[in-house]
């Protein structure tokens, strides 16, 4: 839910009374709600200065929960995105129905990773950043986990190194039965 704080807190309490789990997000504004209306003119002005291209990877629209079409390459689509409800559950369900089993969250926290896990718990959910953690290490750990779950990143473009800047130490995932951490030290 997004909107007026008093109303959303009341609705969250009512939902929890009926057994529906809720999580309050730490955000500065009521994003994806009519509360974004005051910035829409400025947003659209800036959005019209950008050049849009058809995506080369299929995208599921958060506004419909279905595969996005040409509308995703318009400023109006993105203005609607910041003002209207995000259909997160439907989006993850559609991705699940398209056999998506790995989610890599590109963002400042792991909030969406945790939310996706509640919708599709059998998939792999990988955040690329975590609050109050060393960002390069967190990103490298996420990419290592991505590799270990079946997708190999192009490492040399992600972690370039020279004799003066050797590759960083990579924390390797704990083997499931050993319970000990391993560290790979680059040469």
Pin down the residues of each PLM region.
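Acyltransferase
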Residues: 1-106, 110-112, 161
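Flexible, low-complexity segments
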Residues: 67, 73, 77-187
């Amino acid at each position: 839910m997004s909107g007026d704080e008093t109303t959303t807190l009341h609705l969250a309490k009512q939902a929890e009374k009926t057994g529906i789990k809720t999580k309050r997000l730490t955000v500065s504004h009521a994003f994806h709600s009519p509360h974004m209306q005051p910035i829409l003119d400025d947003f659209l002005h800036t959005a019209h200065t950008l050049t849009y291209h058809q995506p080369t990877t299929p995208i599921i629209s958060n506004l419909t929960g279905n595969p996005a079409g040409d509308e995703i390459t318009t400023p109006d689509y993105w203005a609607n995105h910041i003002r209207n409800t995000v259909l997160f559950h439907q989006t993850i369900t559609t991705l699940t129905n398209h056999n998506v089993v790995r989610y890599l969250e590109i963002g400042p926290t792991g909030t969406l990773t945790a939310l996706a896990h509640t919708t599709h718990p059998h998939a792999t959910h990988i955040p690329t950043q975590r609050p109050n953690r060393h960002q390069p290490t967190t990103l490298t750990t996420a990419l290592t986990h991505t590799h270990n779950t079946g997708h190999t990143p192009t490492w040399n473009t992600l972690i370039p190194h020279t004799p003066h800047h050797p590759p960083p130490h990579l924390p390797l995932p704990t083997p499931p039965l050993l319970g000990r951490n391993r560290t790979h030290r680059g040469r």
